UniProtKB/Swiss-Prot annotation:
Residues 35-157 form the Calponin-homology (CH) domain. Residues 176-200 are annotated as: Disordered. It is a peripheral membrane protein. Its main location: cytoplasm. The modification Phosphoserine is found at S184, S188. Residues 189-198 have a biased composition (Low complexity). Induction: Down-regulated by mitogens. It comes from Mus musculus. One of its GO terms (molecular function) is microtubule binding. It comes from the Eukaryota. PANTHER family: GROWTH ARREST-SPECIFIC PROTEIN 2, TRANSGELIN. This is Growth arrest-specific protein 2.
Length: 314
């Protein structure tokens, strides 16, 4: 069993007196959680479109809408091939997507290209909740929403023979496991790991490393327990955890994904601070599983972090 927590003695993190640094740190955490999704989608787009896209250039490459229109046209061609081979149960949109390929970033034409892509997504069946605003792409204001939209497009496209992004492949893998496997019994003592010994499994070792950083020193510990390959009990929940491209440890949460490190920041009480609205004082969360009803209305929770100076926060 892997247990992780922060000792109150060594706990550090931005408080109300450090709100500027805290805001910067929080933004860096959001970006860190988004990075695996960007990398996965960049690789998917590169393979589909033959244009090199990276996580670093993701929004910049897409922001004039031209590559998205090209993506729609490419996916349509693959749909047509699938329809010729198998009669689909649903009629798919096959139409010319108006696009100005040379549209400057930030221009009206960039917005028009993006709007045309979004219109095509609606025709395809992408739910309104998965779409982004044209401005959100053009002005780089909604990177997460752009990623979620493309993932949903990948899910739909995969039904018609289009190679999906890596995260969608992992979703299919989990769905198959849930369909084929019966409920697993409680793990035997031999399935629990402790100390620094390596399990020899890349995923298990990565989960162990993340859950034990920083080292646990609290008497009441938040536990991460391996139940079976890729299946863990984290706190009070049983979760599927996967390694994306042998690099990122991802948790299947609801209908989406989150980094394991990001999940722990939100759900491990030992990684949170309780801040008083009255005097601004911070204190550790004492409850093993804090809920809003357990908290004083004059307090609120923030995640804790090792403090970084402003110049160190990227």
């Amino acid at each position: 069993m892997m247990c992780t927590a922060l000792s109150p003695k060594v706990r550090s993190g931005p408080g109300l007196s450090d709100m500027h640094q805290y805001s910067q740190w929080l933004a860096s955490r959001h970006e860190a959680n988004l990075l695996p999704m960007k990398e996965d989608l960049a690789l998917w787009l590169t393979n589909l479109l033959g244009k090199e896209i990276t996580a670093e250039t993701f929004m910049e490459k897409l922001d004039n809408g031209a590559l998205l229109c090209q993506l729609a046209a490419t996916v349509q061609e693959k749909f047509k091939e699938s329809m010729d081979a198998n009669k689909p149960a649903k009629t798919l949109p096959l139409k010319k997507i108006p696009c100005k390929a040379s549209a400057p970033s930030g221009s009206f034409f960039a917005r028009d290209n993006t709007a045309n892509f979004l219109s095509w997504c609606r025709d395809l069946g992408v739910d309104e909740t998965c779409l982004f605003e044209s401005e959100g792409l053009v002005l780089h204001k909604q990177p997460r929403e752009v990623c979620l939209c493309l993932l949903e497009l990948g899910r739909i496209a995969a039904r018609y023979g289009v190679e999906p992004p890596g995260l969608i492949k992992l979703e299919k893998e989990i769905e198959q496991e849930e369909t084929l496997s019966a409920p697993s019994p409680s793990p035997s003592p031999s399935s629990k790991s402790s100390g620094k010994k390596s399990t020899g499994n890349l995923l298990d070792d990565a989960v162990k490393r993340i859950s034990e950083d920083p080292p646990c020193k609290c008497p009441t510990k938040f536990c991460v327990e391996r139940l079976s390959q890729g299946r863990y009990r984290v706190g009070e929940k049983i979760l599927f955890i996967r390694m994306l491209h042998n690099k990122h440890v991802m948790v299947r949460v609801g209908g989406g994904w989150e980094t394991f490190a990001g999940y722990l920041l939100k759900h491990d009480p030992c990684r949170m601070l309780q801040i008083s609205r009255v005097d601004g004082k911070t204190s550790p969360v004492q409850s093993k599983s804090p809920t809003l009803k357990d908290m004083n209305p004059d307090n609120y929770l923030v995640v804790s972090a090792t403090y970084k100076a402003k110049k160190e926060i990227k």
